[in-house]
Curated annotation (Swiss-Prot):
UniProt name for this protein: Segregation and condensation protein B
InterPro entries per the UniProt record, alphabetical: ScpB_csome_segregation, WH-like_DNA-bd_sf, WH_DNA-bd_sf
Main location: cytoplasm
Family of this protein: Belongs to the ScpB family.
Subunit (UniProt): Homodimer. Homodimerization may be required to stabilize the binding of ScpA to the Smc head domains. Component of a cohesin-like complex composed of ScpA, ScpB and the Smc homodimer, in which ScpA and ScpB bind to the head domain of Smc. The presence of the three proteins is required for the association of the complex with DNA.
UniProt keywords, alphabetically: Cell cycle, Cell division, Chromosome partition, Cytoplasm
Amino acid sequence: MALDIVNWKAIVEALLYAAGDEGLTKKQLVTVLEIEEAELAGIMEEVAAQYKEDDRGIELTEYADTYMLGTKKEFVPYLKKLIEVPSKGLSQASLEVLAIVSYKQPITRAEIEDIRGVKSERILHSLVSKALLCEVGRADGPGRAILYGTTPVFLEQFGLKTLEELPPLPENAEEDVLQEEADLFFENFNQTFEDIK
């Protein structure tokens, strides 16, 4: 079924939105859309131009052959206001993910999900939007998964000067089964959180 350029742009936008902060590679887009790379390049130029011309808060970015949607820099002051929320407003699941990242960083989403035993994409997006976590690099290997780490905002929100102020993990933490490991992270992190309240 042939689609015109407007429909292609809408489909690309939907795909990039669904992909979140991991974005999609050129290869992934070409495969999903079943088009040639040259055609994709033209579509992406149209999408990027539309975001630049329109009065929108997001833009199309390209990094290492990966496309993603991101917030325009001029709106950063408003995002900073948004993330200035009390840490007590975080859910138990969010605290658990923060605990895992703070002890294991840099860490991929897949590794976090292995430890927790449940999907964590939505929580990660929320924590990134609050500037408590950020992308600190890309993992080696297929897919070049995003590596997550904590931010200065994380330290500030939890009353820490450095990550070294987190309570040490027991020596046998690495030998525990994954669920026990997640429980241990959360217990230690929650204790730190209680100490600084």
